[in-house]
């Protein structure tokens, strides 16, 4: 399989190579791109922008040609279709070019003597791995089809019981009769098969159902062999010693690379009759856990044990914040919140405005900023129909209608709707002007006033009209200008119902109504 695919890849990728440029950082960005989850982002805009950024960091379109990018994509797909162990083995060897990738796989196949198609090594492994004191089941006991072949009473070498284990946790206990107990953990139980029924029992109704069941076919096709036999009393003592040994299980397909190494360790331990070391136990535990046993329901009226229910998934309790920032110790409920918070420490601002080039920490901030260029004001006051770009501005404005003024100046007694307004007002009492222009030395009490002033020196006009292309230094000037194109006149006279684009126009008009009274 891999040889044919390798030849195809080698024939199609014969121009240039990017392996030497494919460093560890590229692999990190590739994994982050493939493993990125939607829940890690605050919304669809941030998720799309993050995927775009990770893809560019991985493929580097500004540095690589289209052919090199295609080569990387084909390489990734080629490694993906390989068996898991071969893919891991190839990545660990860090081949310097594509020819080396193909040759590594071909050398590995020749070393292991694995055909291109599926190989059945069942009998060979049973011969090599059968421990001392065990005997093979006679050919009549080999379960080669879904029909259970049961040894008759006239066999010369009868076996007490035969057990076909499915992959499970690392600890097995064997009774004196060779019965396998506690093979699987409580979360994934494996029913026990009573192999001591007579030929007449095969005619019972549930036997046919068990033979044709999907679960039994999975057991018979699982490519796992493990046989236990007790022939005489002398072998019984060795069998009891084997009960303390860690069981050795090798899958023929999923772990072909790990099998020979573990087999060698097992033979050494078998000769010593000692408890296996912890490192071997961990390797065997990983090997067994990879099988992920799954079985269905137990047939009715059978002597199979009832399986236990799997352990329920642990739910996160309300208010739990498992994600902790290593810099400041602040905790968050979601990983995406922690990711956004860590940008504060790193100073990263990945979201850039295409109009003015200003960068932002979050995509939501960029989206809100772009309203300054488009003039969009989605939040409208239901009382005076005035519109705002931010919800917080609308809430503050609505307080003017409800006459809610919670912030009071202790100097003059004046009240304000916002704390920022009170803070700005206090500077009038102290005369504080902390913001100074470096060009002309003029000082301002507000940073926004300094920003607007500096545009007079730089002649910067960041607010551009999308209709006529005219630019403005301030956003309010753009908003007023846009009303010329839209025909909007939000300021209405309460006396004659005449409307105006600007508030100043309304005030000048209202003077005409009161001119005779003055």
Swiss-Prot record:
Residue intervals of the SCAN box domain: 30-112
Mainly localized where? nucleus
Question: Per the record, where are the segments of Polar residues compositional bias?
Answer: 292-304
- Spell out the subcellular localization from the entry: Nucleus
Q: Please, which domain of life does this record's source organism belong to? A: Eukaryota
Zinc finger residue extent: C2H2-type:
323-345, 351-373, 379-401, 407-429, 435-457, 463-485, 491-513
| Record keyword Hydrolase present | no
What SMART domains would the database entry show? SCAN, ZnF_C2H2
- What GO annotations for molecular function exist for this entry? DNA-binding transcription factor activity, RNA polymerase II-specific; RNA polymerase II cis-regulatory region sequence-specific DNA binding; zinc ion binding
Ranges for the region named Disordered are: 292-325
**What PROSITE patterns would the database entry show?**
SCAN_BOX, ZINC_FINGER_C2H2_1, ZINC_FINGER_C2H2_2
InterPro entries named in the record? SCAN_dom, SCAN_sf, Znf_C2H2_sf, Znf_C2H2_type
Q: Which UniProt keywords apply?
A: DNA-binding, Metal-binding, Nucleus, Repeat, Transcription, Transcription regulation, Zinc, Zinc-finger
Pfam families reported for this sequence: SCAN, zf-C2H2
Under the cellular component aspect of Gene Ontology, which terms does the record hold? nucleus
| Any one Gene Ontology BP term | spermatogonial cell division
Q: What does this protein do?
A: May be involved in transcriptional regulation.
Instruction: Describe the family membership recorded for this protein in Swiss-Prot or TrEMBL.
Output: Belongs to the krueppel C2H2-type zinc-finger protein family.
Q: What is this protein called?
A: Zinc finger protein 449
Chain's gene name: ZNF449
């Amino acid at each position: 399989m891999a040889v044919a695919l390798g030849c195809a890849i080698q024939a199609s990728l014969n121009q240039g190579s990017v392996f030497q440029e494919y460093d560890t950082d590229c692999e990190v960005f590739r994994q982050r791109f493939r493993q990125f989850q939607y829940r890690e982002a605050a919304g669809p805009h941030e998720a799309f922008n993050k995927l775009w950024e990770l893809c560019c960091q991985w493929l580097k379109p500004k540095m690589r040609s289209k052919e090199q990018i295609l080569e990387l994509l084909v390489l990734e797909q080629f490694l993906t279709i390989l068996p898991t162990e071969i893919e891991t083995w190839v990545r660990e060897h860090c081949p310097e070019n594509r020819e080396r990738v193909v040759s590594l796989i071909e050398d590995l196949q020749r070393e292991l003597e694995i055909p291109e198609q599926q190989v059945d090594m069942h009998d060979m492994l049973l011969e090599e791995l059968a421990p001392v004191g065990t005997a093979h089941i006679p050919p009549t006991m080999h379960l080669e089809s879904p029909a259970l072949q049961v040894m008759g009473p006239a066999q010369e070498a009868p076996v007490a019981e035969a057990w076909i284990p499915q992959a499970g946790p690392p600890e097995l206990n064997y009774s004196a009769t060779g019965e396998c107990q506690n093979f699987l953990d409580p979360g994934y139980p494996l029913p026990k098969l009573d192999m001591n029924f007579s030929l007449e029992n095969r005619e019972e109704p549930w036997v046919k159902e068990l033979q044709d069941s999907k679960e039994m076919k999975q057991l018979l096709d699982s490519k796992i062999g493990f046989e236990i036999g007790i022939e005489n009393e002398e072998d019984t003592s060795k069998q009891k010693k084997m009960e303390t040994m860690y069981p050795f299980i090798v899958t023929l397909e999923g772990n072909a690379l790990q099998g020979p190494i573990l087999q060698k360790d097992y033979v050494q331990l078998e000769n010593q009759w000692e408890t296996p070391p912890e490192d071997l136990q961990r390797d065997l535990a990983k090997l067994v856990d990879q099988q992920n046993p799954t079985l269905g329901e137990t047939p009715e009226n059978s002597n199979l044990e009832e399986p236990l229910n799997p352990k329920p998934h642990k739910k996160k309790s309300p208010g739990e914040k498992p994600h902790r920032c290593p810099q400041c110790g602040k905790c968050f409920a979601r990983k995406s919140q922690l990711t956004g918070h860590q940008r504060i420490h790193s100073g990263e601002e990945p979201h850039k405005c295409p109009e003015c080039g200003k960068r932002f920490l979050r995509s939501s901030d960029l989206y809100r900023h772009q309203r300054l260029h488009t003039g969009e004001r989605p939040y409208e006051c239901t009382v005076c129909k005035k519109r705002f770009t931010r919800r917080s501005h609308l809430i503050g404005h609505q307080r003017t209608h409800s006459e809610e003024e919670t912030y009071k100046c202790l100097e003059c007694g004046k009240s304000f709707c916002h704390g920022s307004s009170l803070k700005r007002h206090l500077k009038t009492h102290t005369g504080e002007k902390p913001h100074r222009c470096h060009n002309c030395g003029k000082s301002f009490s507000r940073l926004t006033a300094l920003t607007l002033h500096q545009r007079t020196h730089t002649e910067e006009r960041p607010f551009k009209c999308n209709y006529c292309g005219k630019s403005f230094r301030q956003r309010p000037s753009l908003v007023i200008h846009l009303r010329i194109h839209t025909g909007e006149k939000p300021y209405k006279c309460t006396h004659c119902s005449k409307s105006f684009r600007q508030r100043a126009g309304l005030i000048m008009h209202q003077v005409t109504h009161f001119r005779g009274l003055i």
